């Protein structure tokens, strides 16, 4: 069904209305920049709060599986709930065609409960999101105003600080968060999970998510290819203090499975269909979900472009360190600047998405031959696979380096294993070795050196141990 809905709903809409006002929310017009522009040509007004029927579903550490409904019209529902003023409050706001009781929304709360005590409020506006895309994009304004109203009730009635509020919005939900933030002075943080492009990219700041909407705005871009012709749903525009572009921000690894295997997904037909239609777009919240339980597995590197990142021009982290994409990005919030900052990293194809980046530099010994070289790292937490370091003419004394992303943080590196081959019959049986291999983890400035005086024939592993002091001189 989602396949049949998605594209037509992006295109449908109707022209009507000029201005409408709602109690406690203010007035909404169809004047520029909200409508009648090249980006927003259709003149639509947002639906009424009654028609959208936004619900605020509270989960806490005390009720992690059954929500309590908080009502804007009755603050006593907050007082009677498990909401605790001493805790941070994180709102999770879904996007187009989604709903507040979707598995990923509830799972995000559950992951949080494993690492913190928190008020987790799922914002359900499915009646306003399950319509034509253009109408849903306009309904964002009312839903954002309602989220701001809920925060205002917390501030006024419960002496709660807006600085303790974190809004997490996916797709259209990211712009809901932006609207709420623009109405809430001192809002602590907004996380935009692949903010949607259509009707928002290139608009003035009051229409979309932007850095002024909270003290700290971080954004994860996973579907930033142009909507036409590539059907990329997310925006490529930098709209936060920190904008993260995992895997380049456009095409996520693991999203190119064939249609049947993608639709008949292990999580069921519905989840599989969603992934087939919008796999890249959905990866943003999947990365965030996993980041909650992996506080150091999504280190992101400041870099001018993904091409530079893949060309090994952005390693290691600068002196001030690298932020972690996702839940813990705000630990780096003191390093925000006036200009938006762009960060890159790679992820895995599927769970587990977390990766740890290493650079390996090796100096050859032995004969001059043509071949390819791989190394694997062994540490206190485990070992990596064999990773490609060099392919070409292997010359003794020459040094080559490469970077790779490991599925685990190996911990304290204890040894390195070297392997070479060329699969060419050579009656002289040449031997090649690595006199020294230097390993550096991306988040660290320290280099670790491993040495060997041996050489080996192809396809035979050579183990290098930490260099003696005299070996590194």
UniProtKB/Swiss-Prot annotation:
List the active-site residues. 171, 194, 281
Q: Does the keyword Signal apply?
A: yes
- Annotated signal sequence range: 1-17
- Going by the entry's taxonomy, the superkingdom of the source organism is recorded as Eukaryota
Q: What is this protein called?
A: Inactive pancreatic lipase-related protein 1
Name the Pfam families on file: Lipase, PLAT
User: What is the native source organism of this protein?
Assistant: Mus musculus (Mouse)
Disulphide bonds in the chain = 21-27, 109-120, 255-279, 303-314, 317-322, 451-467
Where would you say this protein principally sits, based on its record?
A: secreted
